[in-house]
Design a protein with these regions (language model features):
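The feature marks the first
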Residues: 2-48
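Surface-exposed beta-loop interaction hotspot
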Residues: 81, 91-105
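Short acidic, glycine/proline-enriched loop segments that cap or flank alpha-helices
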Residues: 90-94, 110-113, 127, 131, ...
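Short helix-capping and inter-helix turn/linker motifs at the boundaries of alpha-helical repeat units
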Residues: 2-6, 51, 96-97, 129-131
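Primarily EF-hand calcium-binding motifs
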Residues: 7-22, 49-75, 99-113, 135-153, ...
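Short, charged, intrinsically disordered terminal tails
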Residues: 167-175
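Amphipathic regulatory helices of Ca2+-sensor modules
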Residues: 27-45, 72-89, 116-130, 152-166
Length: 175
């Protein structure tokens, strides 16, 4: 499958974000560091929810590394694996690879235990991934498709999918 320019650019952003040590390859330790940094910024260290987030991030890495055939993916290998396992499989790819991470993030953000993300919880999320909190309200309004005042896991997975497909400009996994 040949990726559209926006899709390719978004995956390249993801590669740069996840190459945490800047060595030109994405490794399991990069995903561990990313998960641990998010957990720390959300103040969730030592919780069962933090363990789930770490496991989800490492599960996502493992799927991509298996598709790439390498535990250290260079840019080309990462782009090919992400296209094959996520973009190329459409909703099924996002459900399989991305949804566990979104569910784990919601598990940490969801302070009131309703299984969804409120506007206040969204502010915490944006701050944790290094995005300007001022855009959280605008992003929330755009993503709240059912106008419930809360974001479901489905709405968030769809938003990540739409970002990577170039349908929105809200980088929920960071930039």
């Amino acid at each position: 499958m040949v990726m559209a320019t926006t899709q390719s650019n978004r995956l390249e952003e993801r590669f740069r974000l996840w190459d945490r040590n800047g060595n030109g390859v994405v490794e399991r330790s990069d995903f561990e560091r990313e998960a641990d940094d998010i957990i720390a910024r959300l103040g969730a260290q030592g919780t069962p929810q933090a363990d789930k987030l770490r496991q989800a991030y490492l599960g996502m890495f493992d799927k991509l590394a298996e598709a790439a055939g390498s535990p250290a993916m260079n840019r080309g290998q990462f782009l090919q694996a992400a296209d094959q396992e996520i973009i190329g499989k459409g909703d099924d790819g996002f459900a399989s690879v991305v949804k566990p991470t979104i569910e784990a993030i919601v598990g940490i953000l969801d302070r009131d235990g309703d299984g969804e993300v409120s506007p206040g919880e969204m502010h915490g999320w944006f701050a944790a991934i290094g995005l300007d909190g001022g855009v959280a309200d605008s992003a929330f309004r755009q993503l709240d498709i059912d106008n419930s005042g809360k974001l479901s896991v489905k709405e968030l997975v769809d938003a990540v999918r739409d970002y990577h497909l170039g349908r929105n400009d809200i980088p929920l996994l960071g930039r």
